């Protein structure tokens, strides 16, 4: 399984990730816009990321209520221009398909991204039914599925369709907004994106891999939690004293290192195991709103010739589009 570390549009975040050897990162177009970037020049992945970085772009808009049709269309146009300006350096592009603009608009927009081939990931709308999901698997190698559906009462049906499509066409699936570790294991999704690695510097959480699972402690428990993992922290090559002193950068490095261990461990897990725990006053919570799934799916079916576009990022980037 491959984790996609979100928030890499922020330079300081990107620096921490690169310093820990992270290569697979996610950027949000809406967050770039909200940060007021760029002001006088194009925002280019090639100028901000290392050459071997694996970058996935998403619209970054989860709630479109309140936006008019015109505002949605304007955002879609701006997002499309952003993607084409960065096309040669993107591994994956998550579709912007607000239901308010309707299925005909969505289909027409997909044609505009045809040159991206497997790097364009259409989003299945459950309102269109399973027949539509099957149709998408016949047309696209990689498909995004809303996380709410992965966790719904029909999750077993969706999972069945996913497995069938993977066996039939080598289709890879991308779960959007899945927060349940159980779903990470039981659903045929192979990569997940998360912003949770920033919780230490944002909210004072302690995120640590204890050797068998990822454990998250709220800020109020950091003084009692961090000393428990002194040997783990030191063996990871991190500065225990800095973490004890609540140094934001070192606490964040601990979180990144811990997610790296989770990523390795998830490949070994089978349904029923829980490699992720949030400690809230001593209780285990197996769901976390901060753990987001946005990316692709894989199963034990041999799809050697149908590699995810994230995996392909290690190859030379495609030639830039001709004007």
Predicted regions and their residues:
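Non-catalytic, usually N-terminal nucleic-acid engagement modules in DNA/RNA processing proteins
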Residues: 1-109, 114, 208, 238-246, ...
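Eukaryote-skewed repeat-based solenoidal scaffolds used as protein-protein interaction platforms
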Residues: 58-59, 68, 72-201
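Glycine-rich phosphate-binding active-site loops on the catalytic face of alpha/beta enzymes
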Residues: 148-149, 179-213, 277-290, 320
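A conserved mid-domain beta-alpha-beta active-site/ligand-binding segment of alpha/beta enzyme cores
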Residues: 210-250
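Transmembrane alpha-helices
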Residues: 252-256
């Amino acid at each position: 399984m491959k984790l996609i570390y979100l928030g890499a549009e922020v330079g300081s975040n990107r620096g921490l990730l690169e310093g820990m050897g992270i290569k697979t990162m996610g950027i949000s177009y809406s967050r770039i816009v909200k940060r007021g970037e760029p002001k006088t020049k194009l925002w280019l992945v090639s100028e901000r990321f290392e050459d071997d970085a694996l970058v996935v772009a998403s619209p970054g808009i989860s709630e479109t209520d309140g936006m008019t049709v015109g505002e949605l269309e304007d955002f879609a146009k701006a997002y499309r221009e952003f993607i084409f300006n960065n096309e040669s350096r993107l591994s994956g592009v998550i579709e912007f398909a607000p239901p308010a603009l309707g299925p005909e608009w969505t289909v027409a927009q997909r044609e505009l991204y045809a040159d991206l081939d497997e790097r364009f990931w259409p989003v299945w709308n459950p309102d269109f039914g399973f027949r539509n999901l099957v149709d998408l698997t016949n047309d696209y190698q990689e498909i995004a599925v809303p996380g709410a559906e992965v966790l719904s009462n029909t999750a077993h049906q969706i999972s069945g369709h996913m497995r069938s499509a993977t066996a039939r066409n080598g289709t890879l699936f991308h779960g959007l907004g899945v927060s349940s570790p159980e779903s990470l294991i039981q659903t045929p999704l192979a990569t997940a994106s998360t912003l949770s690695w920033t919780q230490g510097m944002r909210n004072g959480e302690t995120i640590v891999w204890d050797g068998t699972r990822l454990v998250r402690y709220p800020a109020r428990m950091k003084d009692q939690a961090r000393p428990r993992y002194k040997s783990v922290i030191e063996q990871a090559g991190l500065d225990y004293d800095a973490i004890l002193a609540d140094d934001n950068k070192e606490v964040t490095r601990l979180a990144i290192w811990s997610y790296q261990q989770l990523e390795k461990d998830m490949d070994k897990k089978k349904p029923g195991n829980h490699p992720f725990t949030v400690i809230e006053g001593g209780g285990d919570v197996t769901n976390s709103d901060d753990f987001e799934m946005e990316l692709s799916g894989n199963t034990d079916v041999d799809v050697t010739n149908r590699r995810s576009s994230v995996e392909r990022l290690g190859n030379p980037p495609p030639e830039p589009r001709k004007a």
